Amino acid sequence: MAKEAILRANGVDLCAQTFGRRRDPAILLIHGAAASMLAWEDDFCARLAAGSRFVVRYDHRDTGRSVGYPPGRPGYAMRDLMEDAIGLLDALDLPRGHLVGRSMGGGLAMGAALEHPERVASLTLLATSPGGPDLPPMSKEFLAFVTNPRQPDWSDPDAAADHVLTMLRIMAAGSRHFDAKKMRPLIQHELSRTRNIASSQINHFAMATGELIRPRLGEIRVPTLILHGEDDPVFPLGHAQAMAREIPDAHLVVLKETGHLVPRAVWRTVVPAILSHTAHR
């Protein structure tokens, strides 16, 4: 893998890293809210690159080494994060890319496919949602966690790590694949390279989100693969089923014994599925 690099994309500085050979089909990995590039683990990226893909991961604004903003005052909206993805393709001189988005990143990927279809070779949507009042609600446990007004002391790295670990445990929905002892060092490493922990954990939830993408799903014209945990407590399976119905020719793969996370145990399904889906340029 290449060293991390600060790139000028969509008018801001974003930190990105690449794996594999530039001549191979490009995959841009777009993660969810409050997550830096490290949420796409090194081994996951390496497995995709070993399948002859040029893999790009990056830090969203307010995560990792990318541009930061004051806590509670993000100087951007959801649309800006979507344009950041296209800006990274520009910065890397990539005319097109296969977009792989997880959670919020899936929404950004769908938005990019709608607004910049000529730049998007395909979509892979992991644990994401198109939004809509008719879709199943979050689990009571997750909703209680995210609406709890009590916040940890973000200046205390241990307290921040405890908070994130609790959130991920709830997202895992009791999956036997969740290992808190292995997860905690990954969280600590991610937080250690974050400019402002409070901003990273608050600002993506404070930004303006814009209009729901649901009414426009039928306009998506790029090949679309949907990978979704059967036990997802954040976006229950009905969210994925709605996308599979409403995005033309979309294909849904349900991940057994899986919640909102993408644990290593399901990579044996996820990685080959992505490689097969992105075999064209």
Segments (PLM) and residue ranges:
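Active-site loop/oxyanion-hole signature of alpha/beta-hydrolase fold enzymes
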Residues: 63-100
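Short beta-strand/loop motif that positions the catalytic acidic residue
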Residues: 220, 226-228
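Catalytic active-site module of serine/aspartate enzymes centered on a nucleophile-bearing elbow/loop
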Residues: 250-281
